[in-house]
Amino acid sequence: KPYDTLEEVIGIRPSKGSLAEYGVTYRQVDLLPDGSFDYDKIRENINEKTHLVTIQRSKGYQTRPTLSVQRIGELMVDNCYGEFVETMEPSDVGADMIVGSLIKNPGGGLAPIGGYIAGKKECVENAAYRLTSPGLGKEVGASLGILKDFYQGFFLAPTVTAGALKGAIFAANVYEKLGFAVVPNGTESRHDIIQAITFGQPEGVIGFCQGIQAAAPVDSHVTPEPWDMPGYDAQVIMAAGAFVSGSSIELSADGPIKPPYAVYFQGGLTWQHAKFGILKSLQVLVQKGLVTEEQIRKAM
């Protein structure tokens, strides 16, 4: 299943200007109950009219495991949140094209905007022609005078991503010991920076996000609340007191207010800040009566 915000882009949920309006059809093959690929269904859904097979590496607003690089074959891969987490990238195992965001892992917290496309020449050129116009492709486009931030952020990205991973592992260990379901758990291998924590009630999701916001370097005085965000079929709450608007390699958390009431935590430009964010989230949950200080002492 794609990210919620892509459902209207594709046309799963009706929307003006969707791919469906332009006659582009879409088929979805879900993972099997054990998280493996349904190869029979995949074969059934590919025919001579198929132009693109794509896979989403990260979990989105689901609680399934993130897909490892080794499991991704010759596809177009949405690589968001997965860059620099493993020793290989999807292109190393045959992916035709990988795409992602520069305000996530590869921007290192410095890139203020942008995305990337990498892969086989034909695929990159096709994407470039669609982005601009036929005949121009990637030969034109605004650089906005910020290329230095791109390069410096890319240089720092592996270190920043490592700190975010450490923060996610810390969160998993603490919240699992408090009795909440976490994906992945504190000892499982990781393939992106996202930590899912299932609270089973909206108060937990809201309290967690309010704690993360309170730890932010920007707008820490703001109290996030769920709202009807465009592109989603349920209210969503987001905590992101970041230097770069929308940056989720910076300390952030979000989640839809619907069952199973899971929150998705990611980022932290340093491991110390990620740890501080988790401690603030615990403080808010204590204030809301969802956990006790004694439980936290035992979990730590």
Label every PLM stretch briefly.
Residues 1-166, 172-175, 179-183, 272-300:
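Conserved PLP-enzyme active-site core in the AAT-like
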Residues 176-299:
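Conserved C-terminal alpha-helix-loop-beta "cap" of PLP-dependent enzymes
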